[in-house]
A protein has these predicted regions:
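C-terminal capping/extension segments of zinc metalloprotease domains
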Residues: 21-35, 42-64, 71, 79-81, ...
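Membrane-embedded segments
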Residues: 74, 86-87, 95
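Acidic/histidine-rich, surface-exposed loop or edge segments in extracytoplasmic proteins
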Residues: 20-23, 70-76, 109-115
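Post-HEXXH active-site segment of zinc metalloproteases
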Residues: 102-124
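Short, glycine/charged-enriched secondary-structure capping and boundary segments
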Residues: 69-70, 87, 105-106
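Active-site recognition of the HExxH zinc-binding catalytic motif
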Residues: 90-106
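Sec-dependent N-terminal signal peptides
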Residues: 4-16
Length: 226
């Protein structure tokens, strides 16, 4: 009986320690996300309140991170792919752009809601481009957008009936934004040996050639990336 009691006590203490360690781990992650998120808000002088939440879901049901209203939630499935602050900032900046845009709906809610539903791809491009500006203004490397999306957004065969652009198109548009507005990060490319950036280069040869031709011949048309 005494041995059984000691065994139960040991299991309870072990469980409590494990729970405490888990809580500490989650708090550390939440603090990191808050620090990066509010740095982006303050550095870009965004005067629209936005809050950030980290969630660990021990469930077989996939939880999608994103912005709902003025709250941005990042689940562990996405957070686990972020290797550094650049990539966390990349995710948060895209969602901050969507969260800030949601404030516009307060004026004419029906019109704004319909626009975002009817033209989701257009808004996605806007969010991606603005995210580049947000992370640069906050002191992060925008190439983190490319590496993070490369790891977390699978490429589909077509986006004809999808509400989202092909990942290859998104990456090409982000790359063009960096190339034309923030070339310093490509000239001094600290991601050049990064496996995920190298994978992007490997899969974006045709799209980067389209950009090269546009700049070479001083064309002013909008590139239709593949």
């Amino acid at each position: 009986m005494k041995k059984l009691f000691l065994t139960i006590l040991f299991v309870m203490l072990f469980s409590l320690n494990a729970f405490a360690d888990s809580m500490t781990h989650d708090i550390d992650i939440q603090n990191r996300i808050d620090s990066i998120g509010f740095n982006i808000l303050n550095s870009n002088k965004i005067n629209k309140p936005v809050v950030f939440r980290y969630r660990f879901e021990n469930s077989t049901k996939f939880k999608k991170s994103g912005a709902k209203g003025h709250k941005i939630t990042i689940y562990d499935d996405d957070y686990m792919h972020a290797e550094n602050d650049d990539e966390i900032a990349a995710f948060l900046a895209m969602k901050i752009s969507a969260a800030v845009k949601s404030y516009d709906k307060s004026a004419i809610p029906v019109v704004n809601s319909l626009q975002s539903r009817i033209m989701p791809k257009k808004y996605e491009v806007f969010y991606d481009k603005q995210a580049v500006d947000f992370v640069v203004n906050a002191g992060y490397n925008p190439l983190g957008l490319i590496t993070f999306i490369t790891k977390t957004c699978p490429q589909k065969n077509s986006d004809f009936i999808s509400r989202h652009n092909l990942t290859s198109k998104r990456l090409a548009i982000i790359y063009e934004r960096i190339f034309t507005q923030y070339p310093y990060f490509l000239t001094n490319n600290v991601y050049i040996h990064n496996d995920y950036y190298q994978n992007f280069l490997l899969n974006s040869i045709n799209n980067r050639k389209l950009l090269e031709d546009k700049l070479k011949y001083n064309y002013h048309y909008e590139i239709h990336y593949e």
